Swiss-Prot record:
<feature type="transmembrane region" description="Helical; Name=I">
    <location>
        <begin position="46"/>
        <end position="69"/>
    </location>
</feature>
<protein>
    <recommendedName>
        <fullName>Photosystem I P700 chlorophyll a apoprotein A2</fullName>
        <ecNumber>1.97.1.12</ecNumber>
    </recommendedName>
</protein>
<dbReference type="InterPro" id="IPR036408">
    <property type="entry name" value="PSI_PsaA/B_sf"/>
</dbReference>
<feature type="binding site">
    <location>
        <position position="674"/>
    </location>
    <ligand>
        <name>phylloquinone</name>
    </ligand>
</feature>
<dbReference type="GO" id="GO:0009522">
    <property type="term" value="C:photosystem I"/>
</dbReference>
<feature type="binding site">
    <location>
        <position position="571"/>
    </location>
    <ligand>
        <name>[4Fe-4S] cluster</name>
    </ligand>
</feature>
<feature type="binding site" description="axial binding residue">
    <location>
        <position position="657"/>
    </location>
    <ligand>
        <name>chlorophyll a B1</name>
    </ligand>
</feature>
<keyword id="KW-0157">Chromophore</keyword>
<dbReference type="InterPro" id="IPR006244">
    <property type="entry name" value="PSI_PsaB"/>
</dbReference>
<keyword id="KW-0472">Membrane</keyword>
<keyword id="KW-0408">Iron</keyword>
<feature type="transmembrane region" description="Helical; Name=VI">
    <location>
        <begin position="372"/>
        <end position="398"/>
    </location>
</feature>
<keyword id="KW-0411">Iron-sulfur</keyword>
<dbReference type="GO" id="GO:0000287">
    <property type="term" value="F:magnesium ion binding"/>
</dbReference>
<keyword id="KW-0602">Photosynthesis</keyword>
<feature type="binding site" description="axial binding residue">
    <location>
        <position position="665"/>
    </location>
    <ligand>
        <name>chlorophyll a B3</name>
    </ligand>
</feature>
<comment type="function">
    <text>PsaA and PsaB bind P700, the primary electron donor of photosystem I (PSI), as well as the electron acceptors A0, A1 and FX. PSI is a plastocyanin/cytochrome c6-ferredoxin oxidoreductase, converting photonic excitation into a charge separation, which transfers an electron from the donor P700 chlorophyll pair to the spectroscopically characterized acceptors A0, A1, FX, FA and FB in turn. Oxidized P700 is reduced on the lumenal side of the thylakoid membrane by plastocyanin or cytochrome c6.</text>
</comment>
Length: 737
């Protein structure tokens, strides 16, 4: 007898309605809730999924390498990276006639192709790849790695090779492995690749499988390393007129601290990058050995936390400090996942900021569309990770938190202070919202009445002070690094080696861009969005176990619609609802953030910074001079007279709006509407001559309120992303290629 889906839940499998299908999909990855699940089995399943995840990443990398080698123009691009557009892949079946075929036959190709805005060409080139053959080799290597990861995932599900629960709960050994081996050694290994392959290639010396054993990365060899004379490796760096990829102007240094950028590539010096990875690797190898594993030396994290008690009798007694935290964190996968997601979210946002302001890949700074795409991509990923962090924090409080084990410690005291925390966030959000919007609207009104001189324009003097302290001279503040005789400047001059940082910060680069009143306003708009998103997420987590309105909330789980009639006000207050609302605010915030970044850069790249500076101080300026003005080219990607190479983005722009608007159908009309509609459709089917031949194995029932919301949210999010992605890429590539 065939068992119905889902096999992991007999309760759901026996449900006679379509709820079986939807709840089955919704809980497929909630391993904790599956029938017969033990804690050990849960850890083993999750451990194996990590290998599956690695395999997917490997296949994705392999596919990119393969398609660029097969259908791209990598070798032509390497010969002239500033003028050749990189090709992502061919278009097999171009629609819409000869005009479209002609429009997409671009970048020197003989048939229709897509342009790459991923930055992969720049990355491959920077790390020492120059031929299609090398790309193919990389692709095959990643494919083998993926197959190995899939095998490892399967293997660790077999009875003989399943790790025990004690192995998973050994936090010190896991930290040792992750910090020292995965993070530390891989950073040092990457330094090795940069020193042995990438830096020689950047100086015109090819290093391959045929000669890597007899090409010395440094003329002095390992002598200076063993004699402690490490400074030799920083001597004779590349000169300012070095031609990347050739020996012209090349030095011999491999580990430097030059600062600033290579003048030709406008990217960080490869020798600086190698030095950075070596330092990071050494730090992490040391960090990984701080904790006590099998050898009885080093710290016990539990002992540190148990001992870490605040002094008694201080103003505002701090209770039991960190007592109980070790077991709480070590026994809760949701707590650990929340910490990991929050950390990764912050790092991803930092990656977005650093990729444009201090680019590490050769010539990527001049590929404007790629810069815009990568910044936006990483900020969107960051908000998704951060929302996930708070979601799992809330699930921790519902499923894993033990009030007895955490009595009076920092976690318990945070819950006790939740009213103060939530009300402060509320106050900050209200303050930022009213003041920022008030300034924008005031400026809108006076501009509309023809008196722009009456705008309230605030110079961001504190931010300008930070820029000046870091060496930006244009503000005339003469502080720290922007004052040649200050203690900071004198100390910097005494550090051996070249110093190109001041040239970078005062040159035509993206480090510390000049800022004014428009930046001040949008900075506070973004701050409003961040604080409101945080308010909703923090409130959702802190109230997840219960509130004055619903003290027994934890008994209802993470997501519930309401507690039925007779208990008014219990709708929309589950921890899941907080996550749901926060995602809208997160999208709102990342929208403002990416609008700001993109418009400011469009103005810089086109040599018309006045447009941003003058129009960004009132809302109509944003709507008219950023959104409307930059969508005109995009909307004309195709029209009655034909199409150009923006046609695909024009279509995606429309399609994104459609998906986004569909979200509202689910967000506004609730369960009763859908139930009535479904019953009407079932009635019509049963009375139609052909449709009545189809029977219903499950009785059709409408989505629950929570499900309708998640479907609406998914459409809203996907539509929002598709719409802005199309706008961003088309408006940038339409101007700059």
């Amino acid at each position: 007898m065939a068992t119905k889906f889902p096999s992991f839940s007999q309760g759901l499998a026996q449900d006679p309605t379509t709820r079986r299908i939807w709840y089955g999909i919704a809980t497929a990855h909630d391993f904790e809730s599956h029938d017969g699940m033990t804690e050990e089995r849960l850890y083993q399943k999750l451990f194996s999924t990590h290998f599956g995840h690695l395999a997917i990443i490997g296949l994705w990398v392999s596919g990119n390498l393969f398609h660029i080698a097969w259908q791209g123009n990598f070798e032509q691009w390497v010969a002239d990276p500033l003028h050749v557009r990189p090709i992502a892949h061919a278009i097999w079946d171009p629609h819409f006639g000869q005009g479209a075929i002609d429009a997409f036959t671009q970048a020197g190709a003989s048939s229709p192709v897509n342009i790459a805005y991923s930055g992969l060409y720049h990355w491959f080139y920077t790390i020492g790849m120059k031929t299609n053959a090398e790309l193919y080799q990389g692709s095959i290597f990643m494919m083998i790695l993926s197959a190995w990861a899939l095998f490892a995932g399967w293997l660790h599900l077999q009875p003989k090779f399943r790790p025990s629960l004690a192995w998973f709960k050994n936090a010190e050994s896991r930290l040792n492995h992750h910090l020292a081996v995965l993070f530390g050694f891989s950073s040092i290994a990457w330094t090795g690749h940069l020193v042995h392959v990438a830096i020689p290639e950047a100086r015109g010396q090819h290093v391959g499988w045929d000669n890597f054993l007899n090409v010395l990365p440094h003329p002095a060899g390992l002598g200076p390393f063993f004699t402690g004379n490490w400074g030799v490796y920083a001597e004779n760096p590349d000169s300012l007129n070095q031609v990347f990829g050739s020996s012209e102007g090349a030095g011999t240094a491999i580990l430097t601290f030059l600062g600033g950028f290579h003048p030709q590539t406008e990217a960080l010096w490869l020798t600086d990058i190698a030095h950075h990875h070596l330092a990071i690797g050494c730090i992490f190898v040391i960090a990984g050995h701080m904790y006590r594993t099998n050898f009885g030396i080093g710290h016990s994290i539990k002992e540190i936390l148990e001992t870490h008690n605040p002094p008694k009798g201080t103003p505002g007694d701090l209770g039991a400090g960190h007592k109980g935290l070790y077991d709480t964190i070590n026994n809760s996968l949701h707590f650990q996942l929340g910490l990991a997601l929050a950390s990764l979210g912050v790092v991803t946002s930092l990656v977005a900021q650093h990729m444009y302001s201090m680019p590490s890949y050769a010539f990527i700074a001049k590929d404007y569309t790629t810069q815009a795409a990568l910044y936006t991509h990483h900020q969107y990923i960051a908000i998704a990770l951060m929302c996930g962090a708070f979601a799992h924090g809330a699930i921790f409080f519902i499923r894993d938190y033990d009030p007895e084990a955490n009595k009076d410690n920092v976690l318990a005291r945070m819950l006790e202070h939740k009213e103060a925390i939530i009300s402060h966030l509320s106050w900050v959000s209200l303050f930022l919202g009213f003041h920022t919007l008030g300034l924008y609207v005031h400026n809108d009104v006076v501009v509309a009445f023809g008196t722009p001189e009456k705008q309230i324009l605030v110079e961001p003097v504190f931010a300008q002070f930070v820029q000046a302290a870091s060496g930006k001279a244009m503000y005339g503040m003469d502080v720290l690094l922007s004052n040649a005789s200050s203690s900071a400047s004198l100390a910097a001059q005494n550090i051996p080696g070249e110093h190109y940082w001041l040239d970078a910060i005062n040159g035509n680069t993206d480090v510390f861009l000049p800022i004014g009143p428009g930046d001040f306003l949008v900075h506070h708009a973004i701050a409003l969005g961040l604080h409101t998103t945080t308010l909703i997420l923090v409130k959702g987590a802190l109230d997840a176990r219960g509130s004055k309105l619903m003290p027994d909330k934890k008994d209802f789980g993470y997501s519930f619609p309401c507690d039925g009639p007779g208990r008014g006000g219990t709708c929309d207050i589950s921890a899941w609802d907080a996550f749901y609302l926060a995602v809208f605010w997160a999208l709102n915030t990342v929208g403002w953030l990416t609008f700001y970044w993109h418009w400011k850069h469009l103005a810089i790249w086109s040599g018309n910074v006045a447009q941003f500076n003058e129009s960004s101080t009132y809302l109509m300026g944003w709507f008219r001079d950023y959104l409307w003005l930059n969508s005109s080219q995009l909307i004309n990607g195709y029209n009655p007279f034909g199409s150009n190479n923006l046609a695909v983005w024009a279509w995606m722009f429309l399609f994104g709006h459609l998906v986004w608007a569909t979200g509202f159908m689910f967000l506004i009309s609730w369960r009763g509407y859908w139930q009535e509609l479904i019953e009407t459709i079932v009635w019509a089917h049963q009375r139609s001559p052909i449709a009545n031949m189809m029977g219903y194995r499950d009785k059709p029932v409408a989505l629950s309120i929570v499900q309708a919301r998640v479907v609406g949210l998914a459409h809203f999010t996907v539509g929002y992303v598709l719409t802005y992605a199309a706008f961003l890429i088309a408006s940038t590539s339409g101007k700059f290629g």
